[in-house]
Amino acid sequence: MKQEKAIVVFSGGQDSTTCLLWALRQFQEVEAVTFQYNQRHKQEIEVAKKIAAKLGVKHHLLDMELLNQLAPNALTRDDIEIEAKEGELPSTFVPGRNLVFLSFASILAYQVGARHIITGVCETDFSGYPDCRDEFVKSCNVTVNLAMERPFVIHTPLMWLNKAETWELADELDALDFVKNETLTCYNGIIADGCGECPACKLRANGYNEYMKMKKERA
């Protein structure tokens, strides 16, 4: 474990919760930051608070509702249908979201004396989101370091993992059931296994089933 401090960009979902658990194994002191941007499922905020409290992690909540004004999308507006047309970005894409989140997480890290920033973005299952790519994160890391003259390190533990491998990581962290039962991934705001119909639920369920099949075959 590094005797250093880390900030985790945290939504209360499967990926960011796995990252939070990973960070708790890696760093001496860990804090989490959640962004309120009028997301479609308001339960996300409450779930994030609950998980942070259960894990004994200091939790910051930042108001980012300006994103909803600048970038109307299916994650923030009930009147926009969740869909993904071939050759187009999904309607859940929020332009600049991860750029803004990582920038503000870096500002918070500066203020609390943290060097490490952890985000759960993933290029393997990135659904076409350009701000989930490894090259974007590396570019952002260089930018915030130049902007604040700090040697921040942005970590992406899930970058090259598919959903089955993300479940495997949760299991390696002795938290498979915790992540399965306590997190909120569903676009319709249903905790744990979710609605089973939205793209996020299907991706999550398929990954879980694939991992459990792999685990059984290894036994």
Swiss-Prot record:
Keywords: ATP-binding, Ligase, Metal-binding, Nucleotide-binding, Queuosine biosynthesis, Zinc
Domain of life: Bacteria
Involved pathway(s): Purine metabolism; 7-cyano-7-deazaguanine biosynthesis
Top EC class of this enzyme: ligase
Family annotation (InterPro entries): QueC, Rossmann-like_a/b/a_fold
Reactions accelerated catalytically: 7-carboxy-7-deazaguanine + NH4(+) + ATP = 7-cyano-7-deazaguanine + ADP + phosphate + H2O + H(+)
Cofactor(s) needed by this chain: Zn(2+)
Family from the record: Belongs to the QueC family.
Its biological purpose: Catalyzes the ATP-dependent conversion of 7-carboxy-7-deazaguanine (CDG) to 7-cyano-7-deazaguanine (preQ(0)).
The protein's name in its UniProt record: 7-cyano-7-deazaguanine synthase
Organism (species): Bacillus licheniformis (strain ATCC 14580 / DSM 13 / JCM 2505 / CCUG 7422 / NBRC 12200 / NCIMB 9375 / NCTC 10341 / NRRL NRS-1264 / Gibson 46)
